[in-house]
Amino acid sequence: MSRGLGDVYKRQVLDKLLEALPEGRVVQVRTPQYKQEYLRLNGKPTTALTAANAYTNGIAARIGHHNDCFMASETDYGTYQNVTEDKKYLGQEGLYLPMGGETCPPDGVSPADCSKAQEEMRNLRWSYLNSDYYKGVNDRWIAQGCMDKIKREMGYRFVLTSGGYTTNVTPGHLLKVVLRVKNEGYAAPFNPRAVELVLRNVSDQTTYVLPLDVDPRKWKPDMESTIEIEAGLPTDMPIGDYDIYLNLPDPMETLRDNPDYSIQLANEGVWEAETGYNSLLMRINVTSDEKTDIYNGVLVFTKK
């Protein structure tokens, strides 16, 4: 948002930005007050976003935040009017919306050290940081040894903590899988994301996919989420061993099969760069010899 504009003109600019973007995509504004005033002018509540109204096409769910002078003065160069209340507001909004920015030359405060910066980024749910500005502060964090950790934990960072599964399954019968994923990052995804369980034949690479009714945007920071899957194997699925993968692709059809847009789990040794799959380090045996439960539901793997 351009500085020096009155509230009515800011509203007009923001109207056009939201109109130009696809539904569900988000813009960012310089201060919490910009968003709150825009909502007030539109007759909307100015309280922080909650799970009840997040991820909708409502205007409150489509306006995130950008701090131009992070930890650079008592008010971050005018980012905050009421520092305590505004930070509380941003911490709540950052659970559902993009929050990030850049540093500035400190004015009236000491440069933020690593511990303070990391604590503040986690509290405010930061998803990105400008690496080019301000070098004086960024280089300080590099010298103090925390920049690599900041990069790892910025935004979401999903770690598979445990899992269990049916090891032997008959075609047409029930496969059970339970996964637990912890988000060790500062924030959560703010754009939609698909989730798929993938079975791939060890011998000939034939692949079967099961879309899951799971929303990774709800895997919030410092929380562990459980995914429980009960699905059927196709009745004509060939006998053999199959490795299990978790795929978190972009849901847009033009990007869904592009591994560059798939989410990579933080666990070592699980990422498959050529497909964008995350190996669960699990293998099932599809066999005609096992007496397992017949599956009569609607969730069935399909051949890719």
Regions found by a protein language model. Name each.
Residues V13-V27, N123-L124:
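A structural motif corresponding to the C-terminal end of an alpha-helix
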Residues Q33-Q36, K135-G136:
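Solvent-exposed loop/turn segments at secondary-structure junctions
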